[in-house]
Amino acid sequence: MVLLSVQQKYILETLRKLGCVRKDQLHALVRGKFQRPGFDISETRMAAMLRQLRSGLGDFHVDDDFVYLARGQPDTARLEAIDIMLELSAGAPQDFTVKVDSPQLLRFALDGDKLKVFSVAKLSHVSDPRLIQRERSERIVWISDSGTPLEGLTLPLKHFFAARQADGSHRFYGSNGP
């Protein structure tokens, strides 16, 4: 039996939801959830927690830049969706899930004056333009494999496109609608 800290339980919960994350993404999520004045989630502390989990749990893996449970595999689109969630939530989303319908990759909530829910979805050159129109009711951040918007892309209100920058961050473009 392994005794886990609250932070380690959160790490496992996060991996059960997301499958596979980069170390820097996991560190940002843990820091966003638990860091308070007088309690720092340093890289050293994070590395120690990951080491303890790896030695205590057989299905917990840390390889190079990735942390995952036994069946988790890196998915570049999902990893980019996690980056977007971290950027928009300043590393502290209220909640998130990957239990979404395709082409959505991730849904997350931002806390503030009003709870705001966003989805990150993948747009490809073969996507039906009606798909974008059908998804009008929610806030959606669209991404593409190329990291650039598709030619002639028109977005409805509350939809955004996340253009990937050279440093891995994103520039967000919104609709021109009312």
Give residue ranges: language-model regions:
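Nucleic-acid-binding surface
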Residues: S5, Y10-L18, D24-Q25, Q52-K116, ...
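Short, structured coil/loop segments at alpha-helix boundaries
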Residues: S5, G38-F39, P74-R78, L150-L155
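Short acidic, hydrophobic short linear motifs in intrinsically disordered regions
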Residues: V21-G38
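Electrostatic, structured charged patches in enzyme active sites and in nucleic-acid/phosphate-binding
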Residues: I82-P178
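Intrinsically disordered, low-complexity serine/threonine- and proline-rich regulatory segments
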Residues: M1-V2
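Short amphipathic alpha-helical interaction segments
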Residues: R36-G56
